[in-house]
Amino acid sequence: QWTVDNGPCSGTTNDAVSIFIYDNTAAAADAGADQELCTPTTTAQLAGNAPVGVAVGTWTVTQGTATFADANDPNTTVSGVSLGETILTWTIDNGPCGTTSDAMRILLFDAGNPDADAGPDQEVCTPVTSATLAGSAVTFPAQGTWSVVQGTGLFADPNDPNTTVTGAGVGENIYAWTVGNGPCANGLTADQMSLFVFDANNPVASAGTDQELCVPATSTTLAGSAVIFPATGTWTLISGTGTIADANDPTTSVTGLTIGLNTFVWTVSNGPCANGITTDTVSIYLFDEGNAIADAGPDQELCTPNTTTILAGSALTFPSQGTWSVVQGTGVFADEND
């Protein structure tokens, strides 16, 4: 304090001066660690470092919105934080020793952000090996990421829910869409979808050659054309009887055939390819071991002008077939197989 005694004039006057001693060794500003919140919470307690001595610290909003309870308190409470990323800066003014600043961010996640949904399965046919995915949208700062679970694929942008994937291999390619939603209850959710790539060169359906069996045999092995996954083949019975061991195996066994004609269809489904659905049939003829041997019936005598008669050949069990033929003389059969 400076005091001036001016006698009877103006008397005694004084004035004070303050000298602030700043600490040159004081630590630079440290705003503390980043924080994550989830709605409905929009408040947080900050953790800046305390100024030393007469130095002064001040919080400011660099990005987003927020209200400080005390902008000069390193451990103040901040409220009204906006959804997304809010950046707060802690600045320490250390007088002639200098000013330092540090920033921290508060990420406010949305509790209403939907769980991960990878979208519907998709089918393409070579030469196409790409597709546009349809993952669920995310609300920042939540983040979604595509990854390959099975097969192959290259994502144009693995964080874009609607990214394009290329280089998918023939078969089933499984992709996962994983959404990270911070500290919310649904903090980490995932879902998968399949991209089926069908081969345009997959052969059309062939049920194999017809077969003939004789009882007591009532089973056989079918010979359908092979399929290239994800194409599928399916056997069905359309006449007769038969139990198919594995309806999707082109070379499955079939049992319980009945005497006569048993017909099976081999259907190949090749997705969106030009030969998407093709079919072929195979006939399995089961002959009766007990079918009678040929008997042309008794000899007959006719007198002109009658030159017609009814023959009496032995009966037969289908698929056995009888055939009349002329050995000597002449004759015309109304039905040579009757």
What are the roles of these predicted feature ranges?
Residues T58-D73, S79, Q143, S147-D160, ...:
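Low-complexity "stalk/linker" and mucin-like segments enriched in Ser/Thr/Pro/Ala/Gly
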Residues V4-S10, D93-C97, G180-N186, S269-N275:
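Short, solvent-exposed loop/turn segments at the edges of extracellular beta-sandwich modules
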Residues T13-Y22, S101-F109, L188-F198, T278-F287:
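C-terminal edge beta-strand
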Residues D73-I87, D160-I174, D249-T263, D338:
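Solvent-exposed segments in extracellular or luminal domains encompassing
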Residues T25-A33, G112-P120, N201-T209, G290-P298:
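Proline-enriched interdomain boundary motifs that mark the N-terminal boundary
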Residues T41-V52, N75, V128-T139, N162, ...:
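A short beta-strand segment in extracellular, disulfide-stabilized domains
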